[in-house]
Amino acid sequence: MNQTISSRAPQKRLAPRLLCVMIGAALGTLSASSWAAAATDSTAENAKKTSATAATAKAEDSKTNDTITVVGAQETFRAGGNDLIPTYLDGQVANGGRIGFLGQQDARNVPFNVIGYTSKMIEDQQANSIADVVKNDASVQNVRGYGNPSQNYRIRGYNLDGDDISFGGLFGVLPRQIVSTSMVERVEVFKGANAFINGISPSGSGVGGMINLEPKRAGDTPLTRVTVDYGSASQVGGALDVGRRYGDDDQFGVRVNVLHREGESAIHDQKERTTAVSTGLDYRGDRARTSLDVGYQKQTIHHMRTDVAIGGATVIPEPPSSTLNYGQSWVYTDMETTFGMLRSEYDVSQNWTVYGSVGASRNEETGQYGAPMLTNNNGDATISRLYVPYVADSVAGLGGIRGHFDTGPITHKVNLGYAANYRTTKSAWNMSGQEDTNIYNPGVIGFPQTVMGSDSQDPQLTSQVRASGLSLSDTLSMMDDKVSLMLGVRRQEVTIRNFDSGVPNSAGSLDAMKVTPIYGIMVKPWEKVSLYANHIEALGPGKSAPYQYNGKPVVNAGQIPGIIHSKQNEIGVKFDNQRYGGTLALFEITRPTGMVDPATNVYGFYGEQRNRGIELNVFGEPVFGTRLLASATWLDPKLTKAADSANNGNDAVGVANYQLVFGGEYDIPVVEGLTATGTVVRSGSQYANEANTLKLKPWTRLDLGVRYTMPMKDTSLTWRANIENVTNERYWESVEDSGTYIYQGDPRALKLSVSMDF
């Protein structure tokens, strides 16, 4: 155990503490100013209540049955910029989100499938990470990393690395692997290929969709919220969320979030610690709008239960007890990130706006990793230790001009944008030999000694990746916006330089360019119904060629063949009557895959995976006091051109052939402020190899909860209790793309919290 401690990077505690002290001082100033505004706020609140009472009386006069229809009046929304889509009814869902460089868009007005999940949902479900949020969407599979705790995703059957989640439309700014939700206002899921709007992500993932996060902003109403929470088995946390606006017209805003949580998780002996601090400043003038977001996050996991490598198993074994930790005490990870983003836009005229943003981050990670590798079907395995320090520095930018003009009966909405991201990574490694273990009876293994490693244990340069693209779009609207046609083109470049412990690897370099189009159409035959179709593509750099294939040298070993060019066609229908809405979509995405041609022993994009699917999502409040959030995805993921021709027509690795999510809330009438919640998730089977001889069974998980909002004088108190995996199901949740690792679902866990607003 002493060896484990000695191998860690020095702990950096001074900066976060100083930052917390500075924020505390700022909060004291904010609190003092809030007392001065209390009388004004009280008057405004009384006016709101009077208005609401009048509206209710009017509704009573006009109703013809026992059903009460509640339609929320949406606030002013400027499409194309950074203003967030107004929330839907109770505030948990927004029907739209960021469409890359096209900015925030209402889903009813664009030929794409996009939805946003809000901070209210995050709070009500006590969702601590992005994975906790997107589990509400059947189009998204939660997938884990390669022997580490990283949260990856699979959208429409294709992988999205956690490193490739965007922040305000910028890649590479967020913490990697796991992102805390404490500073997040929106989690937006764009479903489908997205090269035209987003370009190439740093890792090249996101063929089937993208996740974007938007930061919290100070609202018009002053906010001071203190939250205390508890989670199984002994995690305790506290959070502070403060927002204020200043100026004659409330043009200046400040939002501060502070979080700390630590303790043992529901998995035995696995201890987790999270610290996150963020500050968001913004200015909203008549013509200029700007914002600055800075943040710090540190996450530590000790005695971590990682994935299980399939290894020599010929069948997928039954999962162990859901709480059993088959990791070892020396397995840990420490991840620390400092990041920031600056965004601005300026209206040069009534019809034209220039915009720009820039962001950067530094990620530092160190850890001792060890995942059991099965040697037979009885749970026997071997485990070895891998030490990997890792450093990544990223910077990204976006700029352009958007506007609109008319040519006769046609309105043109034009956007010209340029985006770029650049990332450098450094790493080192050492590893031990193998030790025997068993996933059902892991025992205790001492810290294994190093037997091999890189020349230097200080992280050395391993890669440099730069991606940039110039995009032009024109959305033509006619017939009072009942018909719109989106046309666009993007010129995308990518440059990759790989290194071997700081030494350039000329074979692993790439300089490539692709031009990718977009065309989509939206037709509104009725006020509440929209029909749409699109063709859009995805781009990403391929992997380096292997050095050997079937015991023979590969001709272009180590080389990157070029850019993988995937294509999507989609049609769908959307419905929205401001009480409830939804989308039904049918799509096909084809993606080339890398493989060695047996005839020439040359590596190239000779393979192909084709995913065809149907998506359905429904949200809203069809009956007053009853809210629904449900979705379903059916996929036919086929290997149309496999490395082994005998596998042609088989299902792709790791893609569940269906996933169903049914969530709901019910306001209990007899107790004002009391709400019962529940979510059922059903996932279909997944194959763990291309031969389709290894298969993960379908699984079902039930989550239940209750919350109670207790009004108090000048404050409100909200109690929340959630139980995840109520029946404590044992199941293998997912398998990663190569079929190497399977990951076990989390055990039953209790979450409790109380929040006070004052």
UniProtKB/Swiss-Prot annotation:
Secretion signal span: 1-36
Family: Belongs to the TonB-dependent receptor family.
Species per Swiss-Prot/TrEMBL record: Yersinia enterocolitica
Lineage, broadest ranks: Bacteria, Pseudomonadati, Pseudomonadota, Gammaproteobacteria, Enterobacterales
Gene3D superfamilies xref list: TonB-dependent receptor, beta-barrel domain, TonB-dependent receptor, plug domain
Name of the protein in its database record: Ferrichrome receptor FcuA
Keyword flag Transmembrane: yes
Positions occupied by motif TonB box: 66-73
InterPro entries reported in the protein's UniProt record: Plug_dom (IPR012910), Plug_dom_sf (IPR037066), TonB-dep_rcpt-like (IPR039426), TonB-dep_rcpt_b-brl (IPR000531), TonB_box_CS (IPR010916), TonB_rcpt_b-brl_sf (IPR036942), TonB_rcpt_CS (IPR010917), TonB_sidphr_rcpt (IPR010105)
Underlying gene: fcuA
One term of GO molecular function: siderophore uptake transmembrane transporter activity
Location in or out of the cell: Cell outer membrane
